[in-house]
Amino acid sequence: MNPSRCRILAVGKVRRDWIQKGIELYLKRLPGLTVTELRDSSPEKEADSIRAALRPDETLIALMEQGECLGSIPFARRLKQFENERLVFVIGGADGLTAELKLQAQWQLSLSPLTFPHELARLMLVEQLFRAQSIVQGRPYHRA
């Protein structure tokens, strides 16, 4: 996984300082990975903002409760399959993503069968991206 070929689009702001610090920690470890915050609104307006921010050459990965749930090693392997593509991970607002955006996604991903606040999901995603990179590169961060 090449962090400079990945980005995260997330609806809403991170309001908890400790979550923001965690996100910043992993972003420093993944140079090139960016997070773009989109304004909270109605699901339809959020979907319009997301679509406007998407680039034609990106593979859309929608984070959603009903998505595919993988362990860290299978997640790393799956990301490796996309290594030559530009990836955009999308985290919707409190009401999630619209049905149209979910269908537009090339991969529907769930971070867990549990439900988490969206700002915490953002932290979990950047940590898992770092973990996936360490698994693929054979670095000792992941201990299983």
Curated annotation (Swiss-Prot):
One of its GO terms (cellular component) is cytoplasm. Pfam families: SPOUT_MTase (PF02590). SUPFAM superfamilies: alpha/beta knot. It catalyses: pseudouridine(1915) in 23S rRNA + S-adenosyl-L-methionine = N(3)-methylpseudouridine(1915) in 23S rRNA + S-adenosyl-L-homocysteine + H(+). Keywords: Cytoplasm, Methyltransferase, rRNA processing, S-adenosyl-L-methionine, Transferase. S-adenosyl-L-methionine binds at L63, G92, L111, S112, P113, L114, T115, F116. Gene3D superfamilies: 3.40.1280.10. One of its GO terms (molecular function) is rRNA (pseudouridine-N3-)-methyltransferase activity. It is an enzyme of class 2 (transferase). Its EC number is 2.1.1.177. CDD domains: RlmH-like (cd18081). Its main location: cytoplasm. PANTHER family: METHYLTRANSFERASE, RIBOSOMAL RNA LARGE SUBUNIT METHYLTRANSFERASE H. Homodimer. Specifically methylates the pseudouridine at position 1915 (m3Psi1915) in 23S rRNA. HAMAP family: 23SrRNA_methyltr_H. This is Ribosomal RNA large subunit methyltransferase H. The lineage of its organism: Bacteria, Bacillati, Cyanobacteriota, Cyanophyceae, Synechococcales.
